[in-house]
Amino acid sequence: MAKKVTGYVKLQLPAGKANPSPPVGPALGQHGVNIMAFCKDFNSRTAAQGDLIIPVVITVYSDRSFTFIMKTPPASVLLKKAAGLETKKKPGAGSKEPNKVKVGKVTQKQLKELAQLKMQDMNTTNLESAMRSMAGTARSMGIDVVD
């Protein structure tokens, strides 16, 4: 007999840096999950992914055990990294006026690579559609897509 699911918890955490402080502790604590076990498991699985933000969906069962699925990083995070917008000295989120002020550039080749990476979590199987979706996200952030 399968275990009974008591809840799902969705979080976005920096790779390799999960700790029991908020938001992880309170979110998992209210479901009775062993917080340190999750943090150790998540950190060991994501240690090689650098400073990317990793969305994770945690399934909590009635016996307080859990499993989790890691998704690909958000498109905006991947685009910022590709455009070179986020550095330690100058953290940036994009343009405040994306239709007037452009803050970076990505090439079609970079966009294609990002779309291929992101396709497993998107609702399309067509690479062109995924590229258009990524280009729209870039445009709304004030990032130019160049040939």
Swiss-Prot record:
Disulfide bonds: none
GO biological process, one term: translation
Keywords assigned by UniProt, alphabetized: Methylation, Ribonucleoprotein, Ribosomal protein, RNA-binding, rRNA-binding
Cellular component GO terms, alphabetical: cytosolic large ribosomal subunit
Record's keyword annotation contains Ribonucleoprotein: yes
PTM entry text: One or more lysine residues are methylated.
A single GO molecular function term of this UniProt record: structural constituent of ribosome
InterPro entries found in the cross-reference section: Ribosomal_uL11, Ribosomal_uL11_bac-typ, Ribosomal_uL11_C, Ribosomal_uL11_C_sf, Ribosomal_uL11_CS, Ribosomal_uL11_N, Ribosomal_uL11_N_sf
Short name of one Pfam family: Ribosomal_L11
SUPFAM superfamilies for this protein: Ribosomal L11/L12e N-terminal domain, Ribosomal protein L11, C-terminal domain
Keyword Ribonucleoprotein: yes
Function: Forms part of the ribosomal stalk which helps the ribosome interact with GTP-bound translation factors.
Assembly: Part of the ribosomal stalk of the 50S ribosomal subunit. Interacts with L10 and the large rRNA to form the base of the stalk. L10 forms an elongated spine to which L12 dimers bind in a sequential fashion forming a multimeric L10(L12)X complex.
Similarity-based family: Belongs to the universal ribosomal protein uL11 family.
The name this protein goes by in its record: Large ribosomal subunit protein uL11
